[in-house]
Design a protein with these regions (language model features):
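N-terminal ligand-binding/catalytic initiation module
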Residues: 1-118
């Protein structure tokens, strides 16, 4: 299994390649040859009364290609600016994020890559 970090991702694929892959996956889904599960978030109170922990996952795959699950780990809090309230998130400290994608072959179940997403 390959371990691919953020620097590797930006070096290995272009935005155009990502867009083409997404278009292909959506076409597979439209044709009934792909599956997906919407993102599911699980929230747990933290010891701080003004923030909570959120774990989120989403997954999908295409026939004859790949299956992927994306996982993320966030601390959530609300910030008021004027009359607006926004939901902010971070992992470990503000400005940092933590997510990863596990990629598998749907032909033999082989784990192919662990991709940093954060």
């Amino acid at each position: 299994m390959k371990v691919i970090n953020n620097a590797d991702v930006s070096r290995l694929v272009t935005q155009e390649e990502v867009t083409r892959a997404l278009e292909s996956a959506y076409q597979d889904f439209f044709n009934g040859t792909a599956v997906c599960r919407p993102r599911v978030d699980v929230e747990i109170p933290s010891s701080s009364p003004d923030q909570f922990y959120r774990w989120g996952t989403m997954e999908g795959g295409s026939v004859g290609k790949y299956f992927a699950i994306r996982c993320k780990s966030d601390m959530i809090y609300h910030k008021t600016v004027g009359s607006s309230v926004t939901q902010e998130k971070y992992c470990v400290e503000p400005g940092t994020f933590c997510g990863f994608i596990l990629l598998f072959s749907v032909e033999n179940g082989e784990p192919l890559a662990l991709i940093n997403d954060g």
